[in-house]
């Protein structure tokens, strides 16, 4: 059993592998919890669901860009700093795997931030606008990481 800072004990749950057989980098709820300092009161299932959503969003974003299947892009010949395998899984370097992991974990962190504030209400005068600002900042981390994977700068006209 682990003790959370909220006065109750949450049973320790086993880490759940995320997207382990697709050819994309494998992730896990335990690693996410450790790297993003996720509170213990979130069940592994809730974290798994969030990570699966984030993985699907980021993979779709990357594949749509690489294959030219997104608004404003007609070419199917987009240059990116990695190759795609036969299953459309990228052949990422170790550095790119780290960047991908950061993109997914930041996106899920932003996704779960609304739950954080609902469960962890601080002082009565807590400013909810601050939570939204934090959520946007964390989501921006994810978007910057995806742009880096695609070989793009921090911002572009098509991102506006």
Residue ranges and their predicted role:
Residues 1-83, 144-160:
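Conserved short "hinge" loops at termini or chain/domain junctions
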């Amino acid at each position: 059993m682990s003790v959370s800072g909220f006065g109750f004990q949450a049973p320790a749950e086993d880490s759940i592998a995320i997207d382990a057989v697709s050819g994309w980098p494998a992730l896990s709820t335990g690693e996410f919890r450790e790297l993003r300092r996720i509170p213990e009161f979130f069940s592994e299932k809730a974290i798994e669901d969030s990570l699966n959503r984030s993985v699907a969003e980021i993979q779709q974003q990357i594949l749509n860009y690489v294959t030219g299947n997104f608004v404003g892009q007609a070419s199917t010949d987009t240059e990116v700093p990695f190759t795609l395998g036969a299953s459309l899984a990228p052949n990422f370097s170790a550095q790119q795997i780290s960047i991908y992991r950061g993109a997914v974990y930041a996106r899920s962190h932003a996704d779960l931030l609304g739950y954080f504030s609902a469960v962890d209400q601080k002082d009565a005068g807590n400013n909810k606008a601050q939570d939204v600002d934090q959520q946007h900042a964390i989501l921006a981390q994810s978007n910057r990481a995806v742009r880096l994977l695609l070989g793009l700068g921090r911002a572009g006209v098509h991102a506006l």
